[in-house]
């Protein structure tokens, strides 16, 4: 109970209670209650600050609500565009510069989230690189086998240092379960020998470099299609670190040595290799989560050029082509893709080239791939087609772009990236045009093999999502089956390149550059058919698009917190237009449309139409009013031809002794307009009393005259009537009329005379005489003449009852008259005119000038003014303050009119009574 009692007190009361309390436990409870009150006050202030932050835009500013909504939509669109830009930016320095230049809080929040994302990717990539390096000693058997393969393929080569031999190989460890979360895509291009050639030995499981890729699933192709001959040279390739050193060119490897190496038997085509089994096993057990493949959907601009290059004349390949010892990726790709020097001499060899089997290859990811085998080309030609030349040129452009990636300097740090690759990655986020027309073949690496080169080559492109991976090209030379593998650490969406035995190349793009592919979307295959050297025909390019879906835009914030999709499908109904809304003349129809419409733009149009309609109606009413006024002014004769009726009644009464004579004169003027719409009635009653006093030889007479005027006007066009009367003696009643000063003086003189007469005569006799004269006048008016004077007399008797508005106005007039001439006083109402207390002080000072010095008062000191006026009125005229000083201070600039009117009315009664007492004493 004590705690509840303390909870009901405010902080001041608690502190006073703390001062007078001696018990320690009680003082502790009081302090706890004070702290709780302070905490609640802080919470309320924080809530008030939080609610005021956007109040001007969203809540209080009702007039600019549409503008604030539009501004908010623009801000959301700008944030969405910034999120798209940040998704394609992967440089921490560039993001930091953008963060320093950003001024908005929401933009800075998005940029910080993007910086955290990039740093997390770099840390993840560095961790993976550390795991790979920790497994370095386990690759000893591979090193020995690959060194043997290098010496076998190039017997005349000088042995290189041990360090370079370790750099030449690529460590492909078995992936751990935690490694499978990274987006890694390996695209394998497999070249197999034709049926007539001698097969090579199968690859051992630990010699297969593709076993480290858990995602692609390659089916054995030997049972489904005839194998083809490899188009590449079997010479070993040096490491990229040897690129800057100029060394003499090396002669091509003789075909005899090549045949000597490849003379190992190969199992039947229906037997799958151990490598394919290992790949299948990893892909079946360790599938990547489809939700984690979004980051792998960025495009590689090197593999999808913007515009097709013009065809070039075929280059003569008759001369001996010598490979230099250069470590660039361009030379390595040319070794795999360019024609061998023996091609020109052996045109009659078996059919050349293939890059992979036509069997469908499944790639996990957000897209579903369907591969359609193309029909064999039936056209034969002895000369190369322009498509061949264009394809070779695209191969050279691809190699040149990859060489630029390798030749660029690396960034600092363990996970350095090439500068060119970084620019490509930063540009990959934006939309790029991807040509899918039949006239623009994709850049597929197509080459022709050598006769007798019965080796098979695997061209592998690993596309990893790790940021810290070094983008270096490496050549793997396994021992068992002489498979050459080129791995490029490039970031790109998954791309499948395959070629069947009949010379058909197939390229499949899983996602277009710069777009976000939704889960479950299907991308059909783009088939590019290329004939073999023995069967050189035209170029077929076929694209099978998806059925059209309603376009949708996916916006993903940089921090990955929220994702909004805006469907841009065609609307079911046509949008409203401003012309249709302008044609509607009914406000009710527009109001119903506004209630039923949910689209923001349409609601804005409907509101604009409502405003225009209301403005038109207002203009129409104003024009009609002006027209009626002009018509009234155009008929001045009619306005003067009003019918006026005036009735005058005079009644005199004389006492029996002749000492008192009373006269009552009543004049009634009734004016009717010509059309009968307006009526004005004026009644004037003049009472005159004369008394003669005779004292011996001298006689004197006193005359008192009272004039009372009542006016009443009515109009049949409106139901309201205007009544004019007075129950107060107002000093400024005739101040606005012409000659107001003379009339005011005359009236004041009459009032003084009447007051003196009333005080000198017995009150009973005067009141009785007045009542008797009025009764006689009414009787005479009702007895003679038509009924109009009778009605006028009845109206005049009931006219003296005022309404509330007239009472307030007359009280304001009395206060204004009493405070005329006082500084800082302007009485116009019962609210703001009395807010500073100067009007109260002026009203009291007018009756009691000696009570206080009005000149010392100031409107700024409101409390002193209220205390001075209220205390003086209570002390001098016994007027109890019906309103407190604290209430007036709390109400501020606009106090309650009812409170002020009640107190002013009480003040009027007391001051008026005091004034009458003063007049009685003076008389």
Swiss-Prot record:
Q: Which GO BP terms sit in this record?
A: negative regulation of systemic arterial blood pressure; positive regulation of cardiac muscle contraction
UniProt KW Phosphoprotein keyword: yes
Name the residue ranges with Polar residues bias: 272-285, 293-314, 674-687
Query: Which cellular components does GO assign to this protein?
Result: cytoplasm; cytoskeleton
The keyword Transferase belongs to this UniProt entry's keyword annotation: no
Modification type Phosphoserine: residues:
299, 301, 304, 340, 501, 521, 574, 641, 735, 798
Question: Where do the Calponin-homology (CH) domain residues begin and end?
Answer: 805-912
* Family matches, as Pfam families: CH (PF00307), Smoothelin (PF12510)
Phosphothreonine modification, residue list? 359, 372
Q: Where is the composition biased (Pro residues)?
A: 237-252
- Name the CDD domains for this protein: CH_SMTNA (cd21258)
**Chief place where the protein resides:** cytoplasm
Q: Where is this region: Disordered?
A: 134-456, 542-578, 615-772
Biased composition, class Low complexity, residue ranges: 164-179, 192-205, 366-389, 697-721
Basic and acidic residues: bias regions: 615-638, 744-756
Task: Please provide the record's keywords in A-Z order.
Answer: Acetylation, Coiled coil, Cytoplasm, Cytoskeleton, Phosphoprotein
Q: Name one GO molecular function term.
A: actin binding
- Name positions with the PTM N-acetylalanine: 2
Coiled-coil annotated spans = 24-89, 601-628
Q: Which InterPro entries match?
A: CH_dom (IPR001715), CH_dom_sf (IPR036872), F-actin_Monoox_Mical (IPR050540), SMTN (IPR022189)
Family of the protein in this entry: Belongs to the smoothelin family.
Explain the purpose of this protein.
Answer: Structural protein of the cytoskeleton.
This chain's protein is named: Smoothelin
Gene for this chain: Smtn
């Amino acid at each position: 109970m004590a705690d509840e009692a303390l909870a009901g007190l405010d902080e001041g009361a608690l502190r006073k209670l703390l001062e007078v309390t001696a018990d320690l436990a009680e003082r502790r409870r009081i302090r706890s209650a004070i702290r709780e009150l302070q905490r609640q006050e802080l919470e309320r202030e924080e809530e008030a600050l939080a609610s005021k932050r956007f109040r001007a835009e969203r809540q209080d500013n009702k007039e600019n609500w549409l503008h604030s909504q539009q501004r908010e939509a623009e801000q959301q669109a700008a944030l969405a565009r910034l999120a798209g830009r940040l998704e394609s930016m992967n440089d921490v320095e560039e993001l930091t510069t953008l963060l320093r230049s950003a001024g908005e809080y929401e933009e800075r929040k998005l940029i910080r989230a993007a910086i955290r994302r990039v740093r997390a990717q770099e840390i993840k990539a560095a961790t993976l690189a550390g795991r790979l390096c920790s497994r370095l000693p386990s690759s000893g058997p591979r090193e020995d086998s690959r060194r043997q393969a290098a010496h076998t393929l190039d017997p005349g080569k000088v042995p290189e240092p041990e360090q370079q031999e370790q750099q030449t190989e690529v460590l492909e460890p078995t992936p751990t379960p935690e490694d499978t979360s990274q987006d890694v895509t390996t695209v394998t291009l497999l070249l197999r020998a034709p049926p007539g050639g001698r097969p090579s030995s199968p690859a051992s499981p630990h010699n297969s470099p593709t076993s480290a890729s858990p995602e692609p699933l390659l089916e054995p192709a030997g049972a489904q299609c005839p194998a083809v001959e490899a188009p590449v040279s079997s010479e070993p390739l040096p490491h990229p670190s040897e690129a800057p050193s100029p060394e003499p060119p090396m002669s091509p490897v003789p075909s005899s040595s090549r045949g000597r190496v490849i003379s190992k038997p190969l199992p039947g085509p229906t037997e799958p290799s151990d490598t394919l089994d290992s790949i299948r096993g990893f892909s079946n057990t360790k599938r990547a989560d489809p939700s984690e493949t979004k980051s792998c959907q960025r495009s590689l601009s090197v593999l999808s050029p913007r515009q097709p290059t013009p065809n070039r004349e075929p280059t003569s390949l008759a001369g001996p082509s010598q490979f230099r010892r250069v470590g660039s990726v361009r030379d390595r790709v040319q070794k795999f893709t360019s024609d061998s020097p023996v091609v020109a001499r052996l045109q009659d060899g078996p059919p050349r080239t293939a890059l992979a089997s036509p069997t469908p290859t499944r790639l996990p990811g957000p897209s579903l791939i369907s591969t359609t085998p193309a029909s064999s080309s039936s056209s034969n030609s002895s000369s190369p087609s322009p498509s061949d030349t264009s394809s070779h040129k695209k191969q050279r452009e691809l190699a040149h772009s990859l060489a630029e990636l390798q030749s660029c300097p690396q960034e600092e740090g363990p996970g350095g990236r090439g500068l060119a690759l970084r620019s490509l990655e930063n540009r990959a986020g934006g939309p790029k045009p991807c040509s899918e027309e039949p006239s623009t073949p994709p850049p597929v690496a197509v080459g022709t093999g050598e006769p007798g080169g019965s080796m098979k080559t695997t061209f592998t492109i690993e596309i990893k999502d790790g940021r810290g991976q070094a983008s270096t090209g490496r050549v793997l030379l396994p021992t068992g089956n002489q498979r050459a593998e080129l791995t490029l650490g490039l970031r790109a969406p998954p791309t499948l390149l395959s070629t069947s035995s009949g010379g058909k190349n197939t390229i499949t793009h899983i996602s277009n550059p710069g777009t976000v592919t939704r889960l479950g979307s299907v991308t059909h295959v783009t088939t590019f058919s290329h004939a073999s050297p023995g069967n050189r025909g035209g170029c077929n390019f076929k694209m099978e698009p998806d059925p059209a879906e309603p376009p949708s835009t996916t916006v993903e914030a940089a921090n990955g917190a929220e994702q909004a999709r805006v469907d841009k499908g065609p609307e079911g109904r046509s949008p409203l237009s401003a012309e249709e809304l302008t044609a509607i003349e009914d406000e009710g129809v527009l109001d119903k449309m506004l209630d039923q419409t949910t689209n923001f733009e349409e609601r804005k149009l409907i509101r604009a139409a409502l405003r225009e309609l209301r403005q038109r109606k207002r203009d129409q009413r104003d024009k009609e009013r002006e027209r009626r006024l002009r018509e009234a002014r155009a008929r001045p004769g009619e306005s003067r031809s009003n019918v006026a009726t005036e009735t005058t009644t005079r009644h005199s009464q004389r006492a029996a002794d002749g000492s008192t004579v009373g006269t009552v004169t009543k004049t009634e003027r009734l004016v009717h307009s010509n059309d009968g719409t307006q009526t004005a009635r004026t009644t004037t009653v003049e009472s005159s009393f004369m008394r003669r006093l005779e004292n011996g030889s001298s006689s004197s007479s006193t005359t008192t005259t009272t004039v009372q005027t009542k006016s009443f006007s009515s109009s049949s066009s409106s139901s309201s009537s205007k009544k004019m009367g007075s129950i107060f003696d107002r000093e400024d009643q005739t101040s606005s009329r012409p000659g107001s000063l003379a009339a005011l003086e005359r009236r004041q003189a009459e009032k003084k005379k009447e007051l003196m007469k009333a005080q000198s005569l017995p009150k009973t006799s005067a009141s009785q005489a007045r009542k008797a004269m009025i009764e006689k006048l009414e009787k005479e008016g009702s007895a003679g003449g038509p009924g109009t004077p009778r009605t006028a007399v009845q109206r005049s008797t009931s006219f003296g009852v005022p309404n509330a508005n007239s009472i307030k106005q007359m009280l304001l007039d009395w206060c204004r008259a009493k405070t005329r001439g006082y500084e800082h006083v302007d009485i116009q109402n019962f609210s703001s005119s009395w807010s500073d207390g100067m009007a109260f002080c002026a009203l009291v000072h007018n009756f009691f000038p000696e009570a206080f010095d009005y000149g010392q008062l100031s409107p700024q000191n409101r409390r002193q003014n209220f205390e001075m006026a209220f205390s003086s009125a209570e002390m001098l005229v016994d007027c109890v303050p019906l309103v407190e000083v604290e209430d007036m201070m709390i109400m501020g600039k606009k106090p309650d009119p009812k409170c002020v009117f009640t107190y002013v009315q009480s003040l009027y009664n007391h001051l008026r009574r005091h004034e009458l007492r003063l007049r009685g004493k003076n008389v």
